[in-house]
């Protein structure tokens, strides 16, 4: 979703103090670039937008029906077959948002999750939380030591 840049993995891009000042900020580090991506990228992105589109009958469209941010997400479902008795297939779902200028990517894997669309439910919640916090930064809570804020 970024034009072929391969970035170093990082979980946190910045840390803010309770008053909103930046305590630490880390810039993305490009480790390499995939050549030839530009020619195919628009077709791939269009296909990923169709995955959650009810209009296109996408494989995850039923899970994104009435989702406020559907037009701002690109995604792909995946099902990895399991050939053992009494086990269901593994479910994969990958998504990025915002669609035009991606800032986040979400990958969900559920062992024996049946099909990729099932994994999209978790991704949808993460994306909704991202947009709600981005659009309403005052809802952020600062956790006290040794606690967790969902």
Predicted regions and their residues:
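Short surface loop/edge beta-strand patches of beta-sandwich-type extracellular domains
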Residues: 28-38
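Short, highly charged C-terminal tails/helix-capping segments
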Residues: 137-150
């Amino acid at each position: 979703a970024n034009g072929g840049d391969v970035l170093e993995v990082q979980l946190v891009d910045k840390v803010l103090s309770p008053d909103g000042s930046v305590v630490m900020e880390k810039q993305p580090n490009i480790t390499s670039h995939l050549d030839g991506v530009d020619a195919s990228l628009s077709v791939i992105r269009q296909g990923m937008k169709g995955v959650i589109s009810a209009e296109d009958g996408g494989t995850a469209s039923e899970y994104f029906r009435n989702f406020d941010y559907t037009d701002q997400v690109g995604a792909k479902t995946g099902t990895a077959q399991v050939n053992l008795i009494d086990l269901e297939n593994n479910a994969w779902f990958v998504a990025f948002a915002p669609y035009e200028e991606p800032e986040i990517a979400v990958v969900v894997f559920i062992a024996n999750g049946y099909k990729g669309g099932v994994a999209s439910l978790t991704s949808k919640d993460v994306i909704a939380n991202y947009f709600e916090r981005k659009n309403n930064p005052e809802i952020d809570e600062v956790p006290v030591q040794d606690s967790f804020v969902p």
